[in-house]
Protein backbone atom coordinates (compact mmCIF):
# COMPACT_ATOMS: atom_id res chain seq x y z
CA UNK A 1 0.00 0.00 0.00
CA UNK A 2 1.55 3.34 -1.04
CA UNK A 3 2.44 5.87 1.66
CA UNK A 4 0.52 9.04 0.76
CA UNK A 5 1.78 10.96 3.80
CA UNK A 6 2.84 14.53 2.99
CA UNK A 7 6.21 15.51 4.49
CA UNK A 8 7.50 18.99 5.25
CA UNK A 9 10.50 20.61 6.92
CA UNK A 10 10.63 23.87 8.84
CA UNK A 11 12.64 25.60 11.54
CA UNK A 12 9.63 26.35 13.74
CA UNK A 13 6.22 24.68 14.23
CA UNK A 14 3.54 26.54 16.18
CA UNK A 15 0.60 24.45 17.41
CA UNK A 16 -2.58 26.44 17.95
CA UNK A 17 -3.60 29.64 16.15
CA UNK A 18 -4.17 31.83 19.20
CA UNK A 19 -2.63 35.06 20.51
CA UNK A 20 0.48 33.27 21.83
CA UNK A 21 1.45 31.59 18.53
CA UNK A 22 0.66 34.78 16.59
CA UNK A 23 2.91 36.81 18.89
CA UNK A 24 5.78 34.31 18.84
CA UNK A 25 5.56 33.81 15.07
CA UNK A 26 5.61 37.55 14.37
CA UNK A 27 8.50 38.28 16.73
CA UNK A 28 10.59 35.42 15.28
CA UNK A 29 9.84 36.52 11.72
CA UNK A 30 10.94 40.07 12.57
CA UNK A 31 14.13 38.79 14.21
CA UNK A 32 14.94 36.39 11.36
CA UNK A 33 13.01 37.21 8.16
CA UNK A 34 14.10 34.01 6.35
CA UNK A 35 12.91 31.67 9.13
CA UNK A 36 10.51 28.94 7.95
CA UNK A 37 7.39 28.58 10.13
CA UNK A 38 4.45 26.17 9.97
CA UNK A 39 1.31 26.77 12.07
CA UNK A 40 -1.26 24.03 12.75
CA UNK A 41 -4.78 24.75 14.04
CA UNK A 42 -7.48 22.09 14.53
CA UNK A 43 -10.39 24.53 14.00
CA UNK A 44 -11.22 26.30 10.75
CA UNK A 45 -10.39 29.81 11.96
CA UNK A 46 -7.76 31.55 14.12
CA UNK A 47 -8.44 32.67 17.70
CA UNK A 48 -11.67 30.66 18.10
CA UNK A 49 -10.95 29.33 21.60
CA UNK A 50 -9.38 31.29 24.50
CA UNK A 51 -8.38 34.28 22.32
CA UNK A 52 -11.90 34.92 21.01
CA UNK A 53 -13.50 38.14 22.29
CA UNK A 54 -16.52 36.41 23.85
CA UNK A 55 -14.37 33.71 25.48
CA UNK A 56 -12.32 36.03 27.72
CA UNK A 57 -12.90 39.22 29.71
CA UNK A 58 -11.04 41.39 27.21
CA UNK A 59 -9.41 43.27 30.06
CA UNK A 60 -6.01 44.66 29.18
CA UNK A 61 -4.72 43.04 32.40
CA UNK A 62 -2.51 45.69 34.00
CA UNK A 63 -3.36 44.82 37.63
CA UNK A 64 -5.09 48.21 37.87
CA UNK A 65 -8.34 46.67 39.09
CA UNK A 66 -7.85 42.93 39.68
CA UNK A 67 -7.68 42.44 43.45
CA UNK A 68 -6.37 38.86 43.21
CA UNK A 69 -2.97 40.23 42.08
CA UNK A 70 -2.52 42.08 45.40
CA UNK A 71 -2.93 39.53 48.21
CA UNK A 72 -3.11 40.61 51.83
CA UNK A 73 -0.23 39.11 53.84
CA UNK A 74 -0.60 37.56 57.31
CA UNK A 75 0.51 40.83 58.93
CA UNK A 76 -2.23 42.74 57.08
CA UNK A 77 0.12 44.46 54.61
CA UNK A 78 -0.38 44.29 50.84
CA UNK A 79 2.14 42.61 48.56
CA UNK A 80 2.34 44.64 45.30
CA UNK A 81 5.03 42.52 43.56
CA UNK A 82 2.76 40.50 41.26
CA UNK A 83 0.70 43.58 40.34
CA UNK A 84 3.85 45.52 39.39
CA UNK A 85 5.10 42.60 37.28
CA UNK A 86 1.79 42.32 35.39
CA UNK A 87 1.59 46.09 34.86
CA UNK A 88 5.16 46.04 33.46
CA UNK A 89 4.22 43.18 31.13
CA UNK A 90 1.20 45.03 29.74
CA UNK A 91 3.40 48.05 28.96
CA UNK A 92 5.56 45.67 26.86
CA UNK A 93 2.43 44.50 25.00
CA UNK A 94 1.45 48.14 24.32
CA UNK A 95 4.91 48.83 22.86
CA UNK A 96 4.88 45.79 20.56
CA UNK A 97 1.32 46.45 19.36
CA UNK A 98 2.33 50.08 18.66
CA UNK A 99 5.24 48.80 16.56
CA UNK A 100 2.86 46.57 14.56
CA UNK A 101 0.48 49.50 13.95
CA UNK A 102 3.29 51.90 12.95
CA UNK A 103 4.73 49.34 10.54
CA UNK A 104 1.26 48.68 9.05
CA UNK A 105 1.50 45.02 10.02
CA UNK A 106 -1.92 45.23 11.70
CA UNK A 107 -4.71 47.61 10.66
CA UNK A 108 -6.22 50.46 12.68
CA UNK A 109 -5.81 50.05 16.47
CA UNK A 110 -9.50 50.92 17.00
CA UNK A 111 -10.23 47.40 15.73
CA UNK A 112 -8.69 45.79 18.80
CA UNK A 113 -8.09 48.26 21.67
CA UNK A 114 -10.21 50.93 23.36
CA UNK A 115 -9.83 53.14 26.43
CA UNK A 116 -12.08 51.92 29.25
CA UNK A 117 -11.34 53.01 32.86
CA UNK A 118 -10.37 50.19 35.25
CA UNK A 119 -11.98 50.24 38.69
CA UNK A 120 -11.98 48.13 41.85
CA UNK A 121 -15.19 48.30 43.90
CA UNK A 122 -15.87 46.92 47.38
CA UNK A 123 -18.36 47.29 50.23
CA UNK A 124 -18.24 46.65 54.00
CA UNK A 125 -15.75 48.02 56.55
CA UNK A 126 -13.18 45.24 56.17
CA UNK A 127 -13.10 45.37 52.37
CA UNK A 128 -13.01 49.19 52.30
CA UNK A 129 -9.98 49.08 54.60
CA UNK A 130 -8.32 46.45 52.36
CA UNK A 131 -8.87 48.60 49.26
CA UNK A 132 -7.43 51.66 51.01
CA UNK A 133 -4.30 49.68 51.96
CA UNK A 134 -4.05 48.31 48.42
CA UNK A 135 -4.30 51.81 46.99
CA UNK A 136 -1.54 53.07 49.31
CA UNK A 137 0.71 50.11 48.45
CA UNK A 138 0.25 50.57 44.69
CA UNK A 139 -0.03 54.33 44.24
CA UNK A 140 3.46 54.94 45.63
CA UNK A 141 4.79 53.11 42.54
CA UNK A 142 5.21 55.20 39.35
CA UNK A 143 3.38 52.56 37.28
CA UNK A 144 0.25 53.07 39.46
CA UNK A 145 0.78 56.78 40.26
CA UNK A 146 -2.38 57.86 38.38
CA UNK A 147 -4.65 55.69 40.54
CA UNK A 148 -7.29 57.50 42.63
CA UNK A 149 -9.24 56.21 45.64
CA UNK A 150 -12.59 57.41 46.95
CA UNK A 151 -15.32 56.60 49.46
CA UNK A 152 -17.30 59.68 48.45
CA UNK A 153 -20.81 58.75 47.28
CA UNK A 154 -20.99 61.48 44.63
CA UNK A 155 -17.54 60.67 43.25
CA UNK A 156 -18.45 56.98 42.96
CA UNK A 157 -21.68 58.00 41.23
CA UNK A 158 -19.69 60.01 38.70
CA UNK A 159 -17.32 57.10 38.02
CA UNK A 160 -19.96 54.36 37.76
CA UNK A 161 -23.53 55.74 37.66
CA UNK A 162 -25.14 52.38 36.81
CA UNK A 163 -23.44 50.58 39.72
CA UNK A 164 -24.53 53.33 42.14
CA UNK A 165 -28.20 53.36 41.06
CA UNK A 166 -30.45 52.29 43.94
CA UNK A 167 -27.77 52.60 46.65
CA UNK A 168 -28.04 54.59 49.89
CA UNK A 169 -25.60 57.42 50.67
CA UNK A 170 -24.71 55.90 54.07
CA UNK A 171 -23.51 52.54 52.66
CA UNK A 172 -19.86 51.64 53.30
CA UNK A 173 -18.45 51.71 49.76
CA UNK A 174 -15.05 52.37 48.19
CA UNK A 175 -13.50 52.30 44.73
CA UNK A 176 -10.23 52.95 42.94
CA UNK A 177 -10.09 54.40 39.45
CA UNK A 178 -7.49 54.20 36.67
CA UNK A 179 -8.34 56.31 33.66
CA UNK A 180 -5.76 54.62 31.41
CA UNK A 181 -7.36 51.14 31.52
CA UNK A 182 -8.18 49.33 28.27
CA UNK A 183 -10.56 46.83 26.72
CA UNK A 184 -8.85 44.54 24.20
CA UNK A 185 -10.45 42.36 21.54
CA UNK A 186 -7.80 39.64 21.48
CA UNK A 187 -9.68 37.73 18.79
CA UNK A 188 -9.53 40.66 16.35
CA UNK A 189 -5.88 41.36 17.23
CA UNK A 190 -4.87 37.70 16.76
CA UNK A 191 -6.64 37.39 13.41
CA UNK A 192 -5.00 40.64 12.18
CA UNK A 193 -1.59 39.28 13.19
CA UNK A 194 -2.17 35.98 11.38
CA UNK A 195 -3.49 37.80 8.29
CA UNK A 196 -0.14 39.58 8.07
CA UNK A 197 1.96 36.57 9.08
CA UNK A 198 0.52 34.08 6.58
CA UNK A 199 1.29 36.40 3.63
CA UNK A 200 5.02 36.33 4.43
CA UNK A 201 7.44 34.07 2.57
CA UNK A 202 8.22 30.91 4.50
CA UNK A 203 5.05 30.95 6.64
CA UNK A 204 2.25 28.39 6.14
CA UNK A 205 -0.92 28.31 8.22
CA UNK A 206 -2.92 25.06 8.18
CA UNK A 207 -6.50 25.13 9.48
CA UNK A 208 -8.51 21.94 10.23
CA UNK A 209 -5.23 20.18 11.02
CA UNK A 210 -4.89 18.26 14.27
CA UNK A 211 -1.58 17.22 15.82
CA UNK A 212 -1.75 13.53 16.76
CA UNK A 213 1.80 12.70 17.85
CA UNK A 214 5.07 14.44 18.69
CA UNK A 215 8.38 12.60 18.95
CA UNK A 216 11.88 13.90 19.47
CA UNK A 217 14.46 12.30 17.19
CA UNK A 218 18.07 11.44 18.01
CA UNK A 219 19.36 14.66 16.43
CA UNK A 220 17.05 16.61 18.84
CA UNK A 221 14.71 17.68 16.03
CA UNK A 222 10.99 16.82 16.21
CA UNK A 223 8.70 14.67 14.08
CA UNK A 224 5.06 15.69 14.31
CA UNK A 225 2.21 13.56 12.95
CA UNK A 226 -0.78 15.58 11.81
CA UNK A 227 -4.17 14.77 10.27
CA UNK A 228 -6.13 17.07 7.96
CA UNK A 229 -9.58 16.84 9.57
CA UNK A 230 -11.38 17.90 6.39
CA UNK A 231 -9.81 15.29 4.05
CA UNK A 232 -8.20 12.69 6.34
CA UNK A 233 -4.83 13.36 4.68
CA UNK A 234 -1.86 12.41 6.89
CA UNK A 235 1.15 14.68 7.24
CA UNK A 236 4.56 14.49 8.92
CA UNK A 237 6.27 17.74 9.84
CA UNK A 238 9.96 17.82 10.77
CA UNK A 239 11.22 20.82 12.72
CA UNK A 240 13.98 22.12 15.00
CA UNK A 241 11.63 23.90 17.41
CA UNK A 242 8.03 23.32 18.56
CA UNK A 243 5.81 25.74 20.46
CA UNK A 244 2.56 24.37 21.90
CA UNK A 245 0.17 27.28 22.35
CA UNK A 246 -3.11 25.42 22.12
CA UNK A 247 -4.91 26.83 25.17
CA UNK A 248 -6.64 24.04 27.06
CA UNK A 249 -5.33 21.60 24.42
CA UNK A 250 -1.72 22.23 25.42
CA UNK A 251 -1.56 19.74 28.30
CA UNK A 252 -2.53 16.63 26.24
CA UNK A 253 0.03 17.69 23.59
CA UNK A 254 2.73 18.13 26.23
CA UNK A 255 1.93 14.61 27.44
CA UNK A 256 2.24 13.29 23.87
CA UNK A 257 5.69 14.90 23.57
CA UNK A 258 6.72 12.81 26.62
CA UNK A 259 9.56 15.07 27.80
CA UNK A 260 10.88 14.84 31.40
CA UNK A 261 10.08 18.53 31.97
CA UNK A 262 6.39 17.80 31.37
CA UNK A 263 6.09 14.97 33.88
CA UNK A 264 4.01 15.71 36.96
CA UNK A 265 1.87 18.37 35.29
CA UNK A 266 -1.89 18.05 35.28
CA UNK A 267 -4.81 20.29 34.42
CA UNK A 268 -8.04 21.26 36.15
CA UNK A 269 -10.70 22.55 33.72
CA UNK A 270 -12.92 25.46 34.76
CA UNK A 271 -15.67 26.59 32.39
CA UNK A 272 -17.21 30.04 32.34
CA UNK A 273 -20.47 31.83 31.63
CA UNK A 274 -21.46 35.51 31.38
CA UNK A 275 -24.63 37.43 31.88
CA UNK A 276 -24.86 39.63 28.80
CA UNK A 277 -26.99 42.78 28.79
CA UNK A 278 -29.54 43.00 25.97
CA UNK A 279 -30.89 46.50 26.74
CA UNK A 280 -29.03 49.29 24.83
CA UNK A 281 -30.20 51.92 27.35
CA UNK A 282 -28.57 50.04 30.23
CA UNK A 283 -25.39 49.37 28.20
CA UNK A 284 -25.05 53.10 27.45
CA UNK A 285 -25.07 54.01 31.17
CA UNK A 286 -21.85 52.14 32.01
CA UNK A 287 -18.34 52.99 30.83
CA UNK A 288 -15.82 51.07 32.97
CA UNK A 289 -14.45 47.69 33.95
CA UNK A 290 -15.47 47.34 37.59
CA UNK A 291 -13.83 44.44 39.42
CA UNK A 292 -14.95 43.21 42.83
CA UNK A 293 -13.55 40.81 45.40
CA UNK A 294 -13.73 37.05 44.82
CA UNK A 295 -15.74 35.00 47.28
CA UNK A 296 -13.83 32.62 49.59
CA UNK A 297 -12.54 29.56 47.72
CA UNK A 298 -13.20 31.06 44.29
CA UNK A 299 -10.45 30.74 41.68
CA UNK A 300 -8.92 34.13 40.73
CA UNK A 301 -10.37 33.89 37.22
CA UNK A 302 -13.82 34.07 38.86
CA UNK A 303 -13.42 37.52 40.39
CA UNK A 304 -16.82 39.11 39.60
CA UNK A 305 -16.74 42.14 37.31
CA UNK A 306 -19.19 44.30 35.41
CA UNK A 307 -17.55 45.09 32.12
CA UNK A 308 -17.89 47.53 29.29
CA UNK A 309 -16.73 45.72 26.15
CA UNK A 310 -16.29 46.96 22.60
CA UNK A 311 -16.51 44.00 20.22
CA UNK A 312 -16.45 44.49 16.45
CA UNK A 313 -17.30 48.17 16.92
CA UNK A 314 -20.30 47.51 19.14
CA UNK A 315 -20.51 48.41 22.83
CA UNK A 316 -21.55 45.55 25.12
CA UNK A 317 -22.03 44.98 28.84
CA UNK A 318 -21.12 41.71 30.58
CA UNK A 319 -21.23 40.47 34.16
CA UNK A 320 -19.47 37.41 35.48
CA UNK A 321 -17.83 35.09 35.04
CA UNK A 322 -19.85 32.31 36.61
CA UNK A 323 -17.58 29.30 36.93
CA UNK A 324 -18.56 25.76 36.12
CA UNK A 325 -16.99 22.36 35.84
CA UNK A 326 -16.58 20.45 32.61
CA UNK A 327 -14.16 17.65 31.80
CA UNK A 328 -13.44 19.33 28.45
CA UNK A 329 -10.12 21.18 28.09
CA UNK A 330 -11.43 23.26 25.16
CA UNK A 331 -14.83 24.74 24.34
CA UNK A 332 -14.67 22.57 21.21
CA UNK A 333 -13.03 19.70 23.10
CA UNK A 334 -14.03 16.22 24.26
CA UNK A 335 -15.57 15.15 27.58
CA UNK A 336 -12.73 12.60 27.75
CA UNK A 337 -10.06 15.35 27.89
CA UNK A 338 -9.68 15.28 31.68
CA UNK A 339 -9.77 11.48 32.23
CA UNK A 340 -7.36 10.88 29.33
CA UNK A 341 -4.94 13.48 30.74
CA UNK A 342 -4.40 11.49 33.96
CA UNK A 343 -1.13 9.54 33.71
CA UNK A 344 1.09 7.64 36.13
CA UNK A 345 3.43 10.63 36.48
CA UNK A 346 0.70 13.14 37.40
CA UNK A 347 -1.85 11.01 39.27
CA UNK A 348 -0.54 11.85 42.77
CA UNK A 349 -0.24 15.62 42.07
CA UNK A 350 -3.79 15.60 40.61
CA UNK A 351 -5.30 13.78 43.63
CA UNK A 352 -3.28 15.88 46.07
CA UNK A 353 -4.35 19.16 44.42
CA UNK A 354 -7.96 18.03 44.63
CA UNK A 355 -7.60 17.17 48.32
CA UNK A 356 -5.90 20.50 49.14
CA UNK A 357 -8.48 22.56 47.26
CA UNK A 358 -11.73 21.51 48.91
CA UNK A 359 -12.98 25.17 49.04
CA UNK A 360 -12.50 25.39 45.25
CA UNK A 361 -14.36 22.12 44.70
CA UNK A 362 -17.19 23.32 46.96
CA UNK A 363 -17.27 26.67 45.13
CA UNK A 364 -17.52 24.99 41.70
CA UNK A 365 -20.33 22.69 42.88
CA UNK A 366 -22.24 25.74 44.16
CA UNK A 367 -21.66 27.57 40.87
CA UNK A 368 -22.85 24.62 38.77
CA UNK A 369 -26.04 24.37 40.85
CA UNK A 370 -26.89 28.08 40.46
CA UNK A 371 -30.34 28.94 39.18
CA UNK A 372 -31.11 32.03 37.03
CA UNK A 373 -32.42 33.64 40.24
CA UNK A 374 -29.06 33.00 41.99
CA UNK A 375 -27.15 34.59 39.12
CA UNK A 376 -29.39 37.67 39.16
CA UNK A 377 -28.84 37.94 42.92
CA UNK A 378 -25.06 38.00 42.30
CA UNK A 379 -25.51 40.64 39.58
CA UNK A 380 -27.63 42.83 41.88
CA UNK A 381 -24.74 43.08 44.33
CA UNK A 382 -23.10 45.16 41.59
CA UNK A 383 -26.18 46.57 39.85
CA UNK A 384 -28.96 46.85 42.48
CA UNK A 385 -31.54 47.93 39.86
CA UNK A 386 -30.81 45.11 37.36
CA UNK A 387 -33.89 43.50 35.77
CA UNK A 388 -33.88 39.84 34.68
CA UNK A 389 -35.45 40.68 31.31
CA UNK A 390 -32.40 42.81 30.36
CA UNK A 391 -29.88 39.97 30.73
CA UNK A 392 -29.23 36.60 29.10
CA UNK A 393 -26.75 33.83 29.88
CA UNK A 394 -23.88 33.28 27.42
CA UNK A 395 -21.20 30.59 27.37
CA UNK A 396 -17.63 31.85 27.81
CA UNK A 397 -14.34 30.07 27.19
CA UNK A 398 -12.79 27.03 28.84
CA UNK A 399 -9.75 27.45 31.10
CA UNK A 400 -7.38 24.75 32.31
CA UNK A 401 -5.66 25.66 35.58
CA UNK A 402 -2.20 24.16 35.96
CA UNK A 403 -1.54 21.44 38.53
CA UNK A 404 2.14 20.80 39.13
CA UNK A 405 4.17 18.60 41.40
CA UNK A 406 5.04 20.39 44.65
CA UNK A 407 8.26 20.02 46.65
CA UNK A 408 6.62 17.32 48.78
CA UNK A 409 5.61 15.31 45.69
CA UNK A 410 1.99 16.37 46.09
CA UNK A 411 0.10 18.67 43.75
CA UNK A 412 -0.15 22.46 43.72
CA UNK A 413 -2.95 24.21 41.83
CA UNK A 414 -1.43 27.22 40.02
CA UNK A 415 -3.61 30.14 38.97
CA UNK A 416 -1.29 31.85 36.53
CA UNK A 417 0.26 31.41 33.13
CA UNK A 418 3.24 29.06 33.00
CA UNK A 419 5.83 28.38 30.30
CA UNK A 420 7.66 25.04 30.34
CA UNK A 421 10.59 24.41 28.03
CA UNK A 422 12.92 21.46 27.51
CA UNK A 423 16.51 21.87 28.69
CA UNK A 424 17.72 21.76 25.07
CA UNK A 425 15.33 24.58 24.09
CA UNK A 426 13.70 22.60 21.26
CA UNK A 427 10.17 22.54 22.72
CA UNK A 428 8.16 25.03 24.76
CA UNK A 429 4.57 24.95 25.95
CA UNK A 430 2.27 27.50 27.53
CA UNK A 431 -0.12 26.29 30.23
CA UNK A 432 -2.63 28.07 32.45
CA UNK A 433 -5.00 31.00 32.25
CA UNK A 434 -5.02 34.60 33.53
CA UNK A 435 -3.32 37.05 32.87
CA UNK A 436 -2.54 35.20 29.63
CA UNK A 437 -3.18 37.19 26.47
CA UNK A 438 -2.48 40.62 28.00
CA UNK A 439 1.04 39.54 28.85
CA UNK A 440 1.60 37.49 25.66
CA UNK A 441 4.46 39.67 24.41
CA UNK A 442 6.45 39.53 27.66
CA UNK A 443 5.85 35.77 27.91
CA UNK A 444 7.06 35.16 24.34
CA UNK A 445 10.11 37.43 24.78
CA UNK A 446 11.03 35.38 27.86
CA UNK A 447 10.44 32.14 25.90
CA UNK A 448 12.75 33.32 23.09
CA UNK A 449 15.49 34.17 25.62
CA UNK A 450 15.20 30.61 27.01
CA UNK A 451 14.95 28.67 23.73
CA UNK A 452 17.00 30.80 21.31
CA UNK A 453 19.78 31.52 23.80
CA UNK A 454 22.61 32.09 21.31
CA UNK A 455 20.68 34.13 18.75
CA UNK A 456 19.13 36.48 21.32
CA UNK A 457 22.62 37.58 22.39
CA UNK A 458 23.61 38.67 18.88
CA UNK A 459 23.72 42.44 18.17
CA UNK A 460 21.25 41.97 15.27
CA UNK A 461 18.55 40.31 17.38
CA UNK A 462 19.10 42.70 20.30
CA UNK A 463 18.80 45.76 18.06
CA UNK A 464 15.59 44.41 16.49
CA UNK A 465 14.14 43.66 19.94
CA UNK A 466 14.78 47.28 20.96
CA UNK A 467 13.14 48.51 17.77
CA UNK A 468 9.99 46.44 18.49
CA UNK A 469 10.01 47.02 22.27
CA UNK A 470 11.92 50.25 23.06
CA UNK A 471 12.16 49.44 26.79
CA UNK A 472 13.56 45.93 26.06
CA UNK A 473 15.96 44.84 28.81
CA UNK A 474 14.76 47.55 31.21
CA UNK A 475 12.13 47.78 33.92
CA UNK A 476 9.80 50.79 33.88
CA UNK A 477 8.47 51.10 37.43
CA UNK A 478 11.86 52.36 38.66
CA UNK A 479 12.33 54.71 35.67
CA UNK A 480 9.41 57.22 35.82
CA UNK A 481 10.66 59.30 32.88
CA UNK A 482 11.03 56.31 30.56
CA UNK A 483 7.62 55.00 31.71
CA UNK A 484 5.98 58.36 30.94
CA UNK A 485 7.69 58.49 27.53
CA UNK A 486 6.57 54.94 26.63
CA UNK A 487 2.99 55.54 27.79
CA UNK A 488 2.74 58.81 25.85
CA UNK A 489 4.11 57.18 22.68
CA UNK A 490 1.93 54.05 22.84
CA UNK A 491 -1.20 56.03 23.75
CA UNK A 492 -0.73 58.21 20.66
CA UNK A 493 -0.13 55.27 18.31
CA UNK A 494 -2.90 53.06 19.73
CA UNK A 495 -5.30 56.03 20.06
CA UNK A 496 -5.96 55.38 23.75
CA UNK A 497 -5.52 57.43 26.94
Swiss-Prot record:
Pathway in which this enzyme or protein is active: Carbohydrate metabolism; tricarboxylic acid cycle; oxaloacetate from (S)-malate (quinone route): step 1/1
One BP term from GO: tricarboxylic acid cycle
Keywords from the named record: FAD, Flavoprotein, Oxidoreductase, Tricarboxylic acid cycle
GO molecular function: 2-hydroxyglutarate dehydrogenase activity; L-malate dehydrogenase (quinone) activity
Alphabetized InterPro entries for the sequence: FAD/NAD-bd_sf, MQO
Cofactor: FAD
Keyword Cell membrane among record annotations: no
Transmembrane segment boundaries: none
Species the sequence originates in: Flavobacterium johnsoniae (strain ATCC 17061 / DSM 2064 / JCM 8514 / BCRC 14874 / CCUG 350202 / NBRC 14942 / NCIMB 11054 / UW101) (Cytophaga johnsonae)
Classification via Pfam families: Mqo
Chemical reaction(s) catalysed: (S)-malate + a quinone = a quinol + oxaloacetate
Gene giving rise to this polypeptide: mqo
Family: Belongs to the MQO family.
Entry's EC annotation: 1.1.5.4
Name of the molecule in the record: Probable malate:quinone oxidoreductase
